[in-house]
């Protein structure tokens, strides 16, 4: 049973990677909606929710960079719909951010953040304190003293870390991502979905298998975009920390039914980086790099399409419950040789 489930998933994986639920057309627009998420925000009590530098806050930098990114994306890709999850200084809940992205049927989710290092912990010997203690019992009980070291504990800012990092959700979060994909399946389907594929039960084994593969597809696309973002950062002289899976703090990435990345634009705890992140020039550079990465991502999607393979696949049942192994082996061979 496990083997057959794997075989079904393998077929869906290939079909999802090629079709993204729909037949490929030469005039197809590969990116229709991009969601830009400015991280954090000011809370109802007026407090800041993100990291703090010497004189600035993550909330403000995220919004400033996101605004410039939105403007550049709209100018560069006028046919692409750009949606903001947070357009003001006020905080938006993580659940609402995901709802905005899923409701607008985003093809891409880019969350803008600022990194920070925790302060360095220090312990210094401040002196000694005399401590009285007793040994023995009864007539043999004796009073004694000893010197006990006293320490002073304090912290200093960690200013060494610098550079960018771009994250995707961790592998252990794939199940949560798959749930998001399945729950938002009606939003992902095109208007004439039933006409093309018939009545599909989102709880059916076939649809669950497809959701699992769609999750895998989103993971691959997220990883590709994250690498492209870091490559563009390197081109402008930023120190790139690379593309990584994030184990914590990425709920909004796993709750969005689309390729999703979280961009750490720099370390606010580094004085040089804090100045750069607050400068108009720095914010424009960061926005331009991400915009170029989106363009590279679109080109990559276009090159991945294989209309011939899609046509052959669509000639079969749209959501097959069983697939012969020889067909799967042929598809798997094609997938590996076409890389």
Functional labels for PLM-detected ranges:
Residues 39-44, 266-270:
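Short connector loops/turns at beta-strand edges and beta->alpha or beta->beta junctions
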Residues 44, 48-52:
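Peptidoglycan cell-wall recognition and remodeling modules
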Residues 1-5:
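Positively charged n-region of N-terminal signal peptides that target proteins for export
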Residues 8-16:
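Bacterial N-terminal signal peptides
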Residues 6-9, 94:
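Generic alpha-helix initiation/capping and coil-helix boundary signal
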Residues 24-32, 51-339:
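Active-site-proximal helix/loop segments of hydrolytic enzymes
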């Amino acid at each position: 049973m496990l083997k057959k489930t794997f075989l079904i998933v393998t077929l869906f994986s290939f079909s999802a990677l090629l079709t993204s639920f729909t037949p490929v057309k030469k005039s197809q627009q590969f990116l229709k909606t991009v969601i830009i998420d400015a991280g954090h925000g000011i809370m109802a009590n007026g407090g800041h929710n993100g990291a703090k530098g010497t004189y600035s806050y993550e909330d403000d930098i995220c919004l400033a960079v996101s605004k410039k990114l939105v403007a550049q994306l709209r100018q560069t890709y006028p046919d692409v719909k750009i949606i903001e999850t947070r357009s003001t200084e006020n905080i938006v809940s993580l659940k609402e951010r995901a709802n905005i992205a899923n409701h607008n049927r985003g093809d891409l989710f880019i969350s803008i953040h600022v990194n920070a290092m925790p302060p360095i912990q220090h312990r210094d010997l401040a002196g000694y304190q005399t401590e009285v203690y007793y040994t023995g019992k009864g007539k043999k009980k004796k009073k004694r003293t000893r010197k006990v070291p006293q320490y002073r504990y304090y912290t200093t800012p960690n200013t060494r870390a610098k550079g960018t990092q771009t994250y995707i959700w961790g592998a252990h979060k794939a199940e949560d991502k798959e749930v998001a994909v399945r729950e938002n399946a009606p939003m992902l389907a095109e208007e004439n979905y039933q006409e093309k594929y018939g009545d599909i039960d989102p709880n059916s084994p076939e649809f669950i298998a497809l959701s699992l593969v769609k999750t895998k597809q989103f993971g691959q696309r997220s990883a590709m975009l994250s690498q492209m973002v870091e490559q563009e950062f390197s081109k402008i002289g930023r120190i790139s920390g690379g593309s990584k899976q994030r184990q914590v703090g990425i709920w909004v990435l796993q709750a969005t039914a689309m390729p999703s990345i979280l961009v750490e634009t720099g370390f606010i705890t580094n004085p040089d980086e804090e100045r750069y992140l607050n400068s108009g020039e720095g914010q424009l550079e960061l926005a331009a790099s991400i915009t170029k990465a989106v363009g590279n991502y679109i080109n990559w999607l276009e090159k991945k399409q294989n209309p011939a393979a899609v046509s052959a696949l669509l000639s079969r049942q749209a959501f097959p419950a069983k697939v012969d192994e020889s067909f799967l082996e042929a598809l798997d061979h094609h997938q590996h040789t076409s890389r």
